């Protein structure tokens, strides 16, 4: 199936010179959505990735992470931006091109030695994925790898995620 054909390009969004890869058209296509989840599942199994939990990155990682967790018989845990989780959290701060940001996870969501797979819709520079992995490793999790729908190859995000399996379905 041509997943790239189901992803809409929006030029000059969110700012001039950027081409936004809009997955809402993929999500609204029942066959494409099923194919996406089935293919992620197959690739995880082929790579012998058996997570206890799927960790979905805010917010589109939730859309693909929950059905993947179901398919892999794993739990699902969200990683969110600050102030979005109601209970006590672990937090990590990370560098952006012009400043810093942070991510949070509930303190009681995961324990030491849980095997986790990090899922998001898109990998660009790899900064947020790396920060998520750092947060999970800080609390004692074993990060098995990453799964993305889209990878923007020119931004070389893989360089920030060495020595871990990375699954991506569509390259730009």
UniProtKB/Swiss-Prot annotation:
Top-level EC class: transferase
Cleaved signal peptide residues: none
InterPro entries documented for this protein: Ade_phspho_trans (IPR005764), PRibTrfase_dom (IPR000836), PRTase-like (IPR029057), UPRTase/APRTase (IPR050054)
Single GO BP term: purine ribonucleoside salvage
Cell location: Cytoplasm
EC numbers on record: 2.4.2.7
Keywords on record: Cytoplasm, Glycosyltransferase, Purine salvage, Transferase
Pfam families the record matches: Pribosyltran
Reaction catalysed by this enzyme: AMP + diphosphate = 5-phospho-alpha-D-ribose 1-diphosphate + adenine
GO cellular component: cytoplasm
Known pathway: Purine metabolism; AMP biosynthesis via salvage pathway; AMP from adenine: step 1/1
Disulfide bonds: none
GO molecular function: adenine binding; adenine phosphoribosyltransferase activity; AMP binding
Family from the record: Belongs to the purine/pyrimidine phosphoribosyltransferase family.
Function: Catalyzes a salvage reaction resulting in the formation of AMP, that is energically less costly than de novo synthesis.
Subunit structure: Homodimer.
Protein name from the UniProt record: Adenine phosphoribosyltransferase
Lineage of the organism: Bacteria, Bacillati, Cyanobacteriota, Cyanophyceae, Oscillatoriophycideae
């Amino acid at each position: 199936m041509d997943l790239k054909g189901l992803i809409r390009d929006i030029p000059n969004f969110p700012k001039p010179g950027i081409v936004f890869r809009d997955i809402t058209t993929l999500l609204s296509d029942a066959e494409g959505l099923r194919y996406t989840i089935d293919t992620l599942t197959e690739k995880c199994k082929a790579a012998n990735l058996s997570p206890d939990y799927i960790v979905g990155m805010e917010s589109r990682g939730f859309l693909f992470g929950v059905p993947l967790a179901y398919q892999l018989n794993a739990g699902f845990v969200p990683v969110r931006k600050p102030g979005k989780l109601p209970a006590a959290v672990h937090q990590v701060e990370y560098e952006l091109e012009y400043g810093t940001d942070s991510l949070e996870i509930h303190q009681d969501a995961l324990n030491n030695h849980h095997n986790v797979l990090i899922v998001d819709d898109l990998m660009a520079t790899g900064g947020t994925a790396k920060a998520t992995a750092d947060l999970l490793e800080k609390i004692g999790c074993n990060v098995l790898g990453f799964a993305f729908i889209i990878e923007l190859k020119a931004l070389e995000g893989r360089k920030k995620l060495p020595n871990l399996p990375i699954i991506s379905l569509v390259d730009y």
